């Protein structure tokens, strides 16, 4: 009898143990499910907070447009100060966000950068050739580059794009690039003396100095559209303040040697000097385009970015940055900067501007323990500032 009771007790204990184990598993699963639900809720709220930051940027840029000074963009503008470069916390009840607005024209546009400019960036010769091959329609690869033949031979084959980049992440698909090579400083690149490093001598990451969308309006400081040097008459140029003999020489050069492809070549016409070059730079362009892609804003670019321009020595770039506390309203004002003479202007004028129409809004939304980082590309057009695209970003700090 005792043995039977003992056996029953053992069975009961086994059943109880199984029930306790089952309840523990159920409780654990419930905790995991509840935690997952909380995380999903926080993810949604963090993204909404980040999107609120983008809307705040749109409102700020609308004020910038309404002020009517869009031909000039500076680091002293309200849009540039907003968010204190990501240091200020904006609270939305239980959630928050930090934000920074960056001038797209303060960075190097990898869709328009020339080979000479790329050679002054932290890139290997293989990366330069491969980048140019990826974005160009030509089917023949450069010496260290790659086209379809290379990409089709990979374990997971694909074709070369043969057109412009749509995101910086796309660089990872290009021969010679990895995620580390794009988003972290490179250590295996040989640099010339022209390269300016960071404040502590560090080599910049490609993503820190690059952009895929940048453009600026093609108007003078007075807001008037620039004349097309390839179609304007000498009289029209004279009406814009260009000396008659220079206007005549420009037309003669155009008629005998063909149209101008660079404004820098206009500055090389016989008779042009530092005094009369100002009227040319501020009033003429090589086409009738109202906007130009890829130019660098002298009012917002860093010394490092400016130094990537062929013809721009580091000391001149440093002098330009030193002038940024007083806005450059027109490119002709650069001639007053020490070291920036006519020769430098001839080499760089086609790649410089004083304003921008593209802004990058970097926002980190926070809800509980969850962060969501977004980057929005905003474009100013005839209707005002608009969102071109929004991307999820890997950064946790601005």
Predicted features, each with a name:
Residues 2-398:
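Compositionally biased linear targeting/interaction segments
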């Amino acid at each position: 009898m005792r043995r039977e009771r003992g056996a029953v007790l053992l069975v009961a204990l086994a059943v109880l143990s199984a029930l306790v184990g089952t309840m523990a598993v159920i409780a654990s699963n419930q905790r995991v499910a509840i935690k997952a639900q909380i995380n999903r809720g926080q993810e949604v709220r963090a993204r909404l907070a980040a999107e609120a930051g983008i809307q705040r940027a749109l409102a700020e840029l609308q004020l910038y447009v309404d002020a009517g000074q869009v031909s000039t963009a500076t680091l002293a503008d309200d849009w540039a100060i907003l968010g204190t470069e990501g240091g200020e916390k904006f609270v939305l009840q239980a959630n928050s966000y930090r934000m920074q607005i960056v001038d797209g024209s303060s960075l190097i546009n990898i869709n328009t950068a020339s080979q000479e400019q790329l050679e002054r960036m932290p890139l290997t010769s293989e990366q330069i050739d491969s980048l140019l091959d990826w974005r160009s329609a030509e089917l023949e690869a450069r010496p260290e580059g790659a086209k379809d033949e290379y990409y089709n031979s990979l374990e997971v084959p694909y074709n070369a794009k043969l057109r412009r980049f749509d995101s910086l992440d796309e660089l990872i698909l290009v021969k010679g690039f990895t995620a580390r090579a794009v988003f972290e400083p490179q250590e295996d690149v040989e640099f010339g003396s022209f390269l300016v490093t960071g404040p502590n001598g560090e080599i910049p990451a490609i993503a820190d100095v690059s952009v895929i969308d940048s453009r600026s309006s093609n108007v003078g400081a007075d807001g008037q559209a620039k004349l097309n040097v390839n179609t304007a008459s000498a009289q029209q140029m004279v009406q814009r303040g260009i000396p008659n003999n220079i206007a005549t020489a420009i037309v003669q050069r155009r008629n005998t040697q063909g149209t101008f492809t660079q404004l820098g070549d206009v500055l090389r016409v016989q008779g042009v000097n530092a005094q009369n070059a100002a009227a040319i730079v501020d009033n003429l362009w090589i086409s009738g385009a109202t906007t130009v892609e890829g130019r660098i804003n002298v009012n917002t670019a860093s010394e490092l970015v400016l130094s990537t321009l062929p013809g721009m020595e580091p000391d001149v770039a440093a002098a330009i940055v030193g002038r940024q506390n007083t806005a450059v309203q027109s490119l002709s004002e650069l001639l007053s900067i020490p070291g920036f003479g006519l020769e430098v202007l001839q080499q760089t004028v086609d790649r410089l501007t004083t304003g921008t129409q593209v802004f990058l809004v970097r926002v980190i939304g926070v809800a509980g323990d969850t962060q969501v980082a977004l980057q929005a590309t905003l474009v100013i057009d005839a209707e005002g500032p608009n969102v071109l695209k929004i991307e999820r970003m890997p950064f946790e700090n601005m």
